[in-house]
């Protein structure tokens, strides 16, 4: 029996494991259909110039593009945990190939979307200290072969926060990583618990960003999403269909309420997916947060100074407009969510933004690459 499926559907342990695999695979197929390789309409023509996919109805871009929420999977992490291995075995072969590639296939896909620099991070999954170190060393080796195109976020063993802080320091100082990407929770435990704070303390000390990324529901969380519908729907609601975003948004509020940002006022936190639903509710949350007890700084100031937001996996104008009305353009960054979304789809979104005028001129440069350069201290070259 799959440990992953047991955790997702513990009250159905008597069913055959192949049924569980079918349920999760069906849900993952929905995710792939929605997010991955949903390329621009066939009415938009493309031509190739210098190996890059170009929309022939728009000017050829001269500015660089940097993406920040772009994934890979290391065998060191995947194969060390049966649940993680089971999860990744459910993905279609072409997605697995892209997740496992840190070489030619990845670079070719960057060219297709005019991506100048991709910041790579591990996909969801817990890792032991040794597995995380091995994964980080492997990523560093791959980056060394394409230093102008690739950068790295570390994977950290969050179950051992002191060790995780040391691994973050090692990766930044020895490998030149630009921060870390961590799962949104550890089996349902959020990082407002002070036992996790050594990681944030170290990130502030090193002046690097922590990217908080959605992950799959714990067994306890999963029960909240089951109902009078198929288990594949429950799976989707607990993950990419809803809870990935609400739970990550909730996490940011928990971190604020716990006093984390008062303890570490220079901390840099990144979240994706247009702000994990927070921008839509921000005014209401700001008003309510004034009743949450005395803070050195209010939520508005924390939002303005400590939170950066990427557009990963989101390619429509209405949520971007909402984000821009609540957040300084200096803290809004382009991303794709590769390989679950295609770089070409991101490029088409850049075209749509240009055409709409929603972001233009110097602000478009900030969104596309300058903000990432400033936050991560990297440099990108135009395609």
Spans of model-derived segments:
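Hydrophobic faces of well-ordered beta-strands that scaffold small-molecule active sites
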Residues: 66-68, 118-120, 151-154, 180-182, ...
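Active-site gating/metal-coordination segments in enzymes
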Residues: 116-251
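Active-site-proximal loop/turn and secondary-structure-junction residues that shape catalytic pockets
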Residues: 72, 124, 156-158, 186, ...
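Aromatic-lined glycan-binding groove of carbohydrate-active enzymes
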Residues: 256-259, 265-302
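Active-site gating loops and adjacent loop-to-helix segments of metal-dependent hydrolytic enzymes
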Residues: 62, 71-100, 218-246, 285-306
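Histidine/acidic-residue-rich catalytic or RNA/ligand-binding cores of hydrolases
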Residues: 77-78, 130, 221-229, 275-290, ...
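Mid-to-C-terminal alpha-helical segments outside catalytic/metal-binding sites
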Residues: 4, 8, 51, 57-117, ...
